[in-house]
Amino acid sequence: MPADTNPAGDIFGGWLMSQMDLAAGNMAARVAQGRAATVSVEAMQFLQPVKVGDEVTLYATLVKVGRTSIRVHVDVWARPRQSDNGQKVTDADFVFVALDEDGTSRPIDLEA
């Protein structure tokens, strides 16, 4: 973790964003029943810093399924290890596109 900190000693925002992309991507791949690629991250803002040692919890919620795209909202909460009180530290919407084996966008089969 010290490698994942910014000059202020807080967790680097890029690390947190990568964890969010993984959480959203897991849901998108399940919905797509296969490969899904991130095409955009929307309206992300950091509300509070995350300290080294904080317990970080991510919640991914399916927002919308289009013909080839999937929108997932991710909320991130952090809780200091010595506390029972967590707080929301960031959230964002991630948009994915379902891909076929050649890496081309494909329709999502909602019937399966």
Name each region found by the language model.
Residues M1-S40, V97-A112:
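Hot-dog-fold acyl-thioester-processing enzymes
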Residues P2-A3, V41-Q48, A78-P80:
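Short, well-ordered turn and helix-capping elements at secondary-structure junctions
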Residues W15-L16, Y59, W77:
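Bulky hydrophobic/aromatic packing residues
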Residues A24-Y59, V63-V65, S69-R71, Q87-A92:
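Hydrophobic beta-strand-centered segment that forms part of the acyl-chain substrate-binding groove
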Residues K51-V52, V63-A112:
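HotDog/MaoC-like acyl-thioester-processing domains
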